[in-house]
Amino acid sequence: MREIVHLQAGQCGNQIGAKFWEVISDEHGIDPTGTYHGDSDLQLERINVYYNEATGGKYVPRAVLVDLEPGTMDSVRSGPFGQIFRPDNFVFGQSGAGNNWAKGHYTEGAELVDSVLDVVRKEAESCDCLQGFQLTHSLGGGTGSGMGTLLISKIREEYPDRIMNTFSVVPSPKVSDTVVEPYNATLSVHQLVENTDETYCIDNEALYDICFRTLKLTTPTYGDLNHLVSATMSGVTTCLRFPGQLNADLRKLAVNMVPFPRLHFFMPGFAPLTSRGSQQYRALTVPELTQQMFDAKNMMAACDPRHGRYLTVAAVFRGRMSMKEVDEQMLNVQNKNSSYFVEWIPNNVKTAVCDIPPRGLKMSATFIGNSTAIQELFKRISEQFTAMFRRKAFLHWYTGEGMDEMEFTEAESNMNDLVSEYQQYQDATAEEEGEFEEEAEEEVA
């Protein structure tokens, strides 16, 4: 089977990672001891994508848990599914990264990285046919951002032909832990642009807005935000975990979603939005799901898709529903909003349907969009970065760990280039190309 090795790094990465394993273990009928208690063959058919089968029929997540301090891992271990993980796969330091990207990437993280790679290698070697890696981390802290990106580049070196997929939590001033988040995020994006194949941008700003506006939670906690993240992660991995035709592995997803290698930052969305512990009082119809899924308010990245255009889209519907109706609704969305889809990639919307809905819902839909509007998110970080960097504020924390100012300047310009690349394809039309070609032919003649 096509296995995925999952890594989680730093406090945020471990918290959303632990939540992800709770949710998918539940969907696959696996209890906290790793025993299967499910009721459907579909749950086991592709179980080895994320789980190893151990002696005595126990299922163990193929997960590597990494942090530079023991705190978060202790709470994962004592959490509801803490005993399901392989004890050797907890790799942690004692020093912490102090929200400093340089500590995670160059000093503290670099000391720990080899022991992490040993565990990763061991997991990869026991795979029948490894398809790739997924990492959950945040871009605002020190460990997830600094050490997370270090791990990515090391794994890339060792497994250059495997897919690298990340779930990256983007910082926001609305839910801010540290003042240097824009630095850490910019330095991380600089790495992600070059070293990942697919990155889901999970934006704290958007999660906060959803909790506040849609779910009417006056003081959203990280638990509330993580509930949304785990629903989204469960949705986008559905095609990988359950039998189906479309985007059934990471590489096929990348082929469908990434028209240009640098533009691999996806905007996830989810419908229906529910708050923790609440139940839906009525099942939504397919048209409602489709309409909600494309709504800017349901996006997990704080960008308005109406300010850009979609290069590609993948949608995953879950639950028992009519395929015909799903196809009709998806076509309907494209026809009504055709100006929001680039016309130079025909058939750029793909839809998958999976029979098994997430817990507590009859039907749900997950949205994965590669939209040029994601540049708004990078612009937001870039502005905050520049404001501090032009005064060289807080730089000594980074230079003290051996970093050079030059690296900041490079990261800044790489991010600005990324923004202009998105803009360039947003403005591109199908006709333009023809004109250029004609001119070129004349010159040749």
Swiss-Prot record:
Residues 429-445 have a biased composition (Acidic residues). A motif (MREI motif) lies at residues 1-4. It is found in: Cytoplasm, Cytoskeleton; Cytoplasm, Cytoskeleton, Flagellum axoneme. Residues 426-445 are annotated as: Disordered. GO terms for cellular component: axonemal microtubule; azurophil granule lumen; cytoplasm; cytoskeleton; cytosol; extracellular exosome; extracellular region; extracellular vesicle. The modification Phosphothreonine is found at T55. Its main location: cytoplasm. GO terms for biological process: flagellated sperm motility; microtubule cytoskeleton organization; mitotic cell cycle; natural killer cell mediated cytotoxicity. Mg(2+) binds at E69. The keyword Membrane does not apply. Keywords: Acetylation, Cell projection, Cilium, Cytoplasm, Cytoskeleton, Deafness, Disease variant, Flagellum, GTP-binding, Isopeptide bond, Leber congenital amaurosis, Magnesium, Metal-binding, Microtubule, Nucleotide-binding, Phosphoprotein. The modification 5-glutamyl polyglutamate is found at E438. One of its GO terms (molecular function) is metal ion binding. The modification N6-acetyllysine is found at K58. SUPFAM superfamilies: Tubulin C-terminal domain-like, Tubulin nucleotide-binding domain-like. The highly acidic C-terminal region may bind cations such as calcium. The MREI motif is common among all beta-tubulin isoforms and may be critical for tubulin autoregulation. Tubulin is the major constituent of microtubules, a cylinder consisting of laterally associated linear protofilaments composed of alpha- and beta-tubulin heterodimers. Microtubules grow by the addition of GTP-tubulin dimers to the microtubule end, where a stabilizing cap forms. Below the cap, tubulin dimers are in GDP-bound state, owing to GTPase activity of alpha-tubulin. It is linked to Leber congenital amaurosis with early-onset deafness: An autosomal dominant disease characterized by severe retinal degeneration and sensorineural hearing loss. Symptoms occur within the first decade of life. Onset at birth is observed in some patients. Dimer of alpha and beta chains. A typical microtubule is a hollow water-filled tube with an outer diameter of 25 nm and an inner diameter of 15 nM. Alpha-beta heterodimers associate head-to-tail to form protofilaments running lengthwise along the microtubule wall with the beta-tubulin subunit facing the microtubule plus end conferring a structural polarity. Microtubules usually have 13 protofilaments but different protofilament numbers can be found in some organisms and specialized cells. Component of sperm flagellar doublet microtubules. Belongs to the tubulin family. This is Tubulin beta-4B chain. The gene is TUBB4B.
